[in-house]
Swiss-Prot record:
Record EC number: 2.3.2.6
Pfam families: Leu_Phe_trans (PF03588)
Catalyses which reaction(s): N-terminal L-lysyl-[protein] + L-leucyl-tRNA(Leu) = N-terminal L-leucyl-L-lysyl-[protein] + tRNA(Leu) + H(+); N-terminal L-arginyl-[protein] + L-leucyl-tRNA(Leu) = N-terminal L-leucyl-L-arginyl-[protein] + tRNA(Leu) + H(+); L-phenylalanyl-tRNA(Phe) + an N-terminal L-alpha-aminoacyl-[protein] = an N-terminal L-phenylalanyl-L-alpha-aminoacyl-[protein] + tRNA(Phe)
Class of this enzyme: transferase
Organism annotation: Synechococcus sp. (strain JA-2-3B'a(2-13)) (Cyanobacteria bacterium Yellowstone B-Prime)
Keywords: Acyltransferase, Cytoplasm, Transferase
Listed name of the protein: Leucyl/phenylalanyl-tRNA--protein transferase
Disulfide-linked positions: none
Superkingdom in the source lineage: Bacteria
Similarity-based family: Belongs to the L/F-transferase family.
InterPro entries (alphabetical): Acyl_CoA_acyltransferase, Leu/Phe-tRNA_Trfase, Leu/Phe-tRNA_Trfase_C
Protein purpose: Functions in the N-end rule pathway of protein degradation where it conjugates Leu, Phe and, less efficiently, Met from aminoacyl-tRNAs to the N-termini of proteins containing an N-terminal arginine or lysine.
A Gene Ontology term for the protein's cellular component: cytoplasm
């Protein structure tokens, strides 16, 4: 399959994201009136019950060591929007330095991870998964720390859910989101 990276990146730069229909697998661009945003400032909240685990060192963090495994982990659900075609797009974005996996490990076992796309100072979280309980939660906390350290200004989680709300995620109005996204595109940040 030939992937047109310029078109894919342009879509994300305009606030859209790709999803495959769970039944047919056909890809389409989606946009929401409001985006779920995970704050990278003092509004981010690490649940009190999770703090000892984050500090314990039980999970180690790695970047881009198991990208394909993270994509497969994110797709391994009874109903998934990550089709084989979308997996190929993520792989092409990864080879080009745009798509990344942020992973938690226990020894040599992949515990969980987050799949996302970095564009300037924006990180667009596509999906997350865990194999060991709390693996994805610790990954989320550590990813926020990582993004802060590297000067990222936006962590777009796309769609709100109760899990993200526990960490302080909030819905940002579409126009405000697009304004912030455009600012972020002009700020060079390195994910690695």
């Amino acid at each position: 399959m030939q992937v047109d990276l310029a078109t894919i990146l342009s879509g994300y730069a305009q606030g859209y994201f790709l999803m495959a229909d769970e039944e047919t697998g056909s890809l389409a661009w989606y946009g929401t009136g409001r985006h779920a945003v995970i704050p990278l400032d003092e509004r981010f909240h690490c649940p009190r019950s999770l703090r000892p685990l984050v500090r314990s060192g039980r999970f180690q963090v790695r970047l881009n060591c198991a990208f394909e495994q993270v994509v497969e982990g994110c797709a391994a659900r009874p109903q998934t929007w990550i089709s084989p075609e979308l997996k190929q797009i993520y792989a092409a974005l990864h080879r080009s330095g745009f798509a990344h996996s942020f992973e938690t490990w226990q020894g040599e076992t992949l515990a969980g991870g987050i799949l996302g796309i970095a564009l300037g100072a924006a990180f667009i979280g596509e999906s997350m998964f865990y194999r060991i309980p709390n693996g994805s939660k610790v990954a989320l906390v550590k990813l926020v720390e990582h993004l802060r350290e590297r000067g990222f200004r936006l962590f777009d989680a796309q769609l709100m859910n109760p899990h993200l709300a526990r960490f302080g995620a909030f819905l940002m109005d579409g126009q405000e989101y697009l304004k912030l996204l455009q600012q972020c595109l002009g700020i060079p940040c390195r994910f690695n």
